[in-house]
Amino acid sequence: MNMETKNGSPVPAGDYSGERDSADITEHEQMDVKPKTNGDSKADRKAANAKDPSRPRRKKARRACFACQRAHLTCGDERPCQRCIKRGLQDACHDGVRKKAKYLHDAPDGALMPAVSSNTNLYNNTLRNNLPISRNGTNAVNSNQQHSQQHPQQPTNPTNNNFYPTPQTQTGSYNPYQESSMGQSPFTTQSPVSPTFNMKSSTNGRNPSLSSTVNQQPTPSTALSGDTSQSQNPFAGPFFDPSDPALFNFDLSSMNFENRYGALEFGMLGHMATGAAGDSPTDSAGQRGSIGRSGSAQFSTPAPGFGESPGNQPFMFGDPLLNEWSAGPASGQHVNVGGVYAPNTMLPEHMKANAPHAFAIESGPASFTSPGSAPSPNIPTAAFDDGPFNNIAPAPKSNSLVPNGQRQVTASILKHPNLQVGPKRRHRNPSSIYESVKEPYAYTSGFHNLTAFIQRRFTPQKTVRIAKALASIRPSFIATTKTLNRDDLIFMEKCFQRTLWEYEDFINACGTPTIVCRRTGEIAAVGKEFSILTGWKKDVLLGKETNLNVNTGGSAVPQSGTTSRGSFTPRGSTLENSGTGRPQPVFLAELLDDDSVVEFYEDFARLAFGDSRGSVMTRCKLLKYKTKEDMEVAQSDDNGKWNNHLRKGGIAGEAGMNQLGFKDGKVDCAYCWTVKRDVFDIPMLIVMNFLPCI
């Protein structure tokens, strides 16, 4: 099967042998020679010389026809080309098929056609003569009489090949390919109306029906067609033809693309970007007869003679709202959304300020303020009083009806008409950290309190192990802090508070039980999941409430040589750290059992000044918060019944999670922690994540 049979074009056999025969070469040379005149024969021979620089050069075609491509001869932009006409092959003259690039291998053949600029004259001539255009740019009906005499024209099915229907030449029609000589402004581009649809007046003198009622949108099958039979049949014509550049008003000739595939891809990206604010053209766009991107008509009366009005402004990328952005409408101007949004879709007042605080590309801002700049009673705005644009008055709120019975809404609430948004959380301002921190943190007092607590709770053997671990990093602490003055220590505390400010959002967003403590082991931040798991309240951990915990993970009977934690008087917020006047937070050693505390400080000694990005993953036992009353309940028989029920039914919700380790007061967990350092390379805080082992 040869190439002619594949393309479906009837070509006489033997015309394209693939070799440059003498007839083709002679014909090619004769086409390059000027028409002979009555001048001297020497001048004719001089003009026939191919190496003569004065010989006129023919402009190379953008794409050769199939016959010229096979013969490797120069072709022209017209179809049929002169060579095919001379050889009587004008009916079979069509564009040749180029070899696809690798990145276009999956692209359809129709999308790789040359850009519109190469066939602009052909489109103009065809539309003026009301001749349909086939997909490859050739006329489906040959208007040349001599061509039809040589070869009979084959009938063409208009349903299959008429991809660009020609608008009817009536008063209300619009030719998208009008030339500037017809009274059109040279800066006016295509109308938003796609030439795929016929803009013609009906026979009874009424305007073409774009919508059945004011509040009812027509389906895409009835869009912009005055023909009753076509409007009733949703499949009468192709609504979306990817090869039609006017469907989305893409000016392919100005994009400098060699094929439609890349130009349409680039244009579609721009179309998607400009459609970020929704399909809501204004009244001026309705007077021009624009249609929405969804294909549904939004206005009932198109204006006749598009592009001929002296007040008509050019459309940027076929979007009238882009022009109104550059035109700068007055402040407080409302956008009439036409039939796209029903009159009863007005948002409540609290929704206006909670709308997205950003400009879409096509929503023309009246000023540089946010569309939702109206103050909300739920959001304190005291922290933003110094803004440079706060003196600009917000757009007036209007609930009045426009003359056509449709409600006006502002551009900030067009995107989500039925969205329910709760009151916003106030944005925290980190500037208060730098203003509130005036004194350095007393780490020396914190280490002294930690040492006293360890001596009271642990046995001498375990106390020695913890002391050795802390003593191994003591020289490093002295070396890094001996050159720091008071201002450096204040700056260190500001860095800690600023980092903790960031971790608070992380803790609230993460569902894992998390705590953050200082290098002394004092708790600085805690998540609610940790409180659910262990029973320790946040205020108790931060030292804001009295600590009544009596659970130390061991026996209440005092051991020999040391004092048990059970005999230690619980301390509260009234017991303040000496010299600082601040409440004492809970230490990390109070949350772990004895073995876990010893193991933690031995790992901390290796990681504090070691690997700055290292972490430790191991298992531990968390101590639940228990008062004396809780300890008595834990020893009762009712708790044994609860543990049996827990083993049978499993853990469900917060109640089941809170009951983990209720009997013995310990929760077996796997935890991961890391050390974060400050700008002086000193351990600043410890971040720990826990997961219970079920």
Swiss-Prot record:
InterPro entries: ERT1_acuK_gluconeogen_tf, PAS_13, Zn2-C6_fun-type_DNA-bd_sf, Zn2Cys6_DnaBD. Residues 65-93 bind DNA. The keyword DNA-binding applies. Coiled coil: none annotated. Keywords: Activator, DNA-binding, Gluconeogenesis, Metal-binding, Nucleus, Transcription, Transcription regulation, Zinc. Belongs to the ERT1/acuK family. This is Transcription activator of gluconeogenesis Pc22g08580.
